[in-house]
């Protein structure tokens, strides 16, 4: 029965064209009715686009629910909440808690039950307590489910609804065109009540891809989105979404149906709560990644995946040219959209986003240096038996323990320089918990799990961590203290709004990486300049074109610039934020920076 009212007609007009891009015409009207019945109780009073989703104040933490644990607490999520309130309450505004659901592998990304909290981590009350103080990012693992999930058990038994939720193919199907992020077999043989079948598994034999060509699968995931929003999510992260739609004879990545489904998700969130942001995780070459902004009608945010490998290479080489070339090629994020900046996460440092951006010699030197610093290289499979490097698995702190020349004594300064560059760029900054804590490679965990990614997934005992953080000479303490200070300074600068103007500067010194940020209201400028090398470097202030009628100060060190024709000496890996607008009261109490402490 068709529901004849204005609200339904408006809803239909907004989703029908998108559904027509995904499904056959025969199922569209029925699907619209089901969608409307599902969403009607949740439709908001206003669905006007919220252009104030973010500001310079937004900073996120990326963490597992059990990255820190304590025997004294009831659950790891309770410990996380305790840590956040003690150390980061004035520093971050949002928390991405990596998949906290029951799972069977891949540290949470093989979800058994989307609607439950893993009891080993805590419960929904723990999640909601954190979301009441911080903007919560929740993963929608949209491409696949665990082979131990109820849906897949139903598939094996041949019962509804799961029997229709997965992709069955012939074992001899030509899959040579399919883009692979892993080296495991794409097709997995499964014994079912109806005999042996082969199903699609992009990431691993335990992660079985769901079949979005079945509209009921779409409805299931929209129900999950609604549940996450009701549970406090302010960001919905679409994990591995680029692989969502499969079509034989294509690469099965970035297909038009995938883009249409993302647009549909955005449209639905817009109708439910315009303040919620959708973020896509597509670890692919830069041009492909940018396509997920669509025509400002797909993702609100995309990961800046090219930044980690390019910034790492720049600091290893001590030169800025590749960073500058990349930055000049990056378009400003569309209105209502933003880049999600990071240089470390639970995964490795992706290499595909650096394709075409580094020359062969530097690419080789990057991989060899990371191996020397204790890192591992993960591979992906091409057609046939060929493999190529996919990501570097290493703690970022250890990745920056030296340069291509070898280890040196500048690890902390180099690491802080990397983080300062990241938080200065156009976009919203996100810090992996093991970056804030300057955690070393965890080789013991790699040996325990047999997985290379475990090297950067250390689990801290809270009491042992506190002992380190209470020691002013501990590198963990020094890094956390200085990063918190820098983040708090950054959050007060309008020129660091995620959509504030960004312009690449070209000082004659290639060891310097410099860019200009200007606030949306055009009343604050910040010249963000960074020494990428292990030697002092001259910065000619005339290269920056500082307006002579303004007073200029470095927000990081407190240094004032009175002679605009002077030469300022940047110490190894030093960063400066030279601005014409600052809080004089805050300036008087400006803490000394790490270089002064040294």
Sequence positions of predicted segments:
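Active-site and adjacent substrate-binding regions of carbohydrate-active enzymes
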Residues: 2-598
């Amino acid at each position: 029965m068709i529901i004849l009212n204005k609200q339904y007609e408006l809803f239909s007009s907004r989703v029908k064209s998108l559904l027509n891009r995904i499904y056959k015409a025969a199922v569209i009207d029925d699907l619209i009715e089901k969608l409307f019945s599902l969403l009607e109780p949740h439709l908001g009073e206003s669905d006007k686009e919220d252009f104030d989703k973010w500001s310079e104040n937004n900073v996120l933490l990326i963490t597992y629910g059990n990255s820190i644990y304590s025997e004294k607490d009831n659950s790891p999520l309770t410990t996380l909440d305790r840590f956040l309130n003690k150390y980061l309450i004035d520093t971050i505004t949002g928390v991405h808690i990596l998949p906290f659901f029951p799972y069977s592998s891949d540290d949470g990304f093989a979800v058994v039950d989307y609607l439950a909290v893993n009891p080993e981590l805590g419960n929904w009350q723990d999640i909601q307590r954190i979301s009441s103080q911080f903007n919560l990012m929740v993963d929608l693992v949209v491409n696949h489910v665990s082979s131990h999930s109820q849906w897949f058990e139903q598939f094996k038994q041949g019962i509804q609804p799961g029997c229709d939720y997965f992709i069955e193919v012939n074992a001899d199907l030509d899959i040579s065109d399919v883009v692979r992020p892993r080296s495991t077999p794409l097709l997995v043989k499964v014994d079912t009540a109806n005999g042996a079948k082969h199903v699609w598994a992009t990431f691993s034999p335990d992660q079985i891809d769901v079949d979005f060509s079945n509209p009921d699968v779409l409805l299931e995931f929209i129900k999950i989105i609604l549940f996450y929003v009701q549970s406090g999510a302010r960001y919905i992260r679409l994990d591995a979404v680029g692989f969502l739609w499969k079509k034989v004879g294509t690469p099965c990545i970035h297909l038009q149906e995938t883009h249409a489904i993302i647009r549909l998700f955005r449209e639905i969130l817009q109708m439910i709560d315009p303040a919620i942001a959708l973020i896509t995780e597509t670890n692919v070459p830069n041009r492909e990644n940018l396509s997920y902004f669509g025509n400002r009608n797909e993702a609100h945010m995309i990961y800046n995946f090219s930044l980690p490998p390019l910034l790492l290479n720049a600091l290893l080489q001590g030169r800025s040219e590749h960073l500058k070339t990349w930055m000049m090629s990056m378009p400003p994020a569309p209105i209502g959209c933003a880049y999600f900046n990071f240089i470390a996460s639970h995964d490795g440092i992706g290499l595909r986003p650096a394709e075409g951006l580094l020359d062969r010699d530097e690419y080789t030197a990057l991989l060899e240096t990371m191996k020397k610093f204790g890192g591992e290289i993960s591979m992906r499979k091409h057609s046939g038996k060929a493999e190529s490097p996919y990501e570097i698995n290493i703690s970022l702190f250890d990745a920056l323990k030296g340069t291509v020349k070898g280890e040196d004594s500048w690890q902390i300064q180099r690491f802080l320089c990397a983080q300062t560059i990241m938080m200065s760029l156009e976009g919203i900054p996100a810090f992996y918990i093991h970056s804030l804590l300057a955690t070393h490679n965890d080789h013991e965990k790699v040996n325990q799990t047999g997985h290379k990614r475990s090297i950067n997934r250390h689990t801290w005992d809270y009491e042992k961590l506190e002992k380190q953080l209470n020691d002013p000479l501990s590198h963990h303490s020094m890094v956390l203290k200085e990063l918190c200070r820098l983040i708090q300074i950054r959050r007060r600068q309008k020129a660091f709004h995620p959509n504030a103007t960004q312009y690449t500067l070209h000082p004659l010194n290639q060891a310097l990486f410099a860019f200009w940020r200007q606030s949306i209201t055009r009343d604050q400028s910040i010249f963000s300049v960074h020494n990428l090398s292990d030697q002092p470097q001259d910065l000619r202030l005339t290269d920056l074109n500082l307006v002579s009628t303004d007073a200029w100060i470095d927000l990081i060190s407190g240094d004032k610039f009175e002679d605009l024709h002077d030469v300022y000496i940047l110490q190894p890996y030093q960063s400066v934020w030279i601005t014409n607008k600052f809080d004089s009261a805050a300036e008087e109490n400006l803490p000394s920076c790490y270089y002064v402490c040294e």
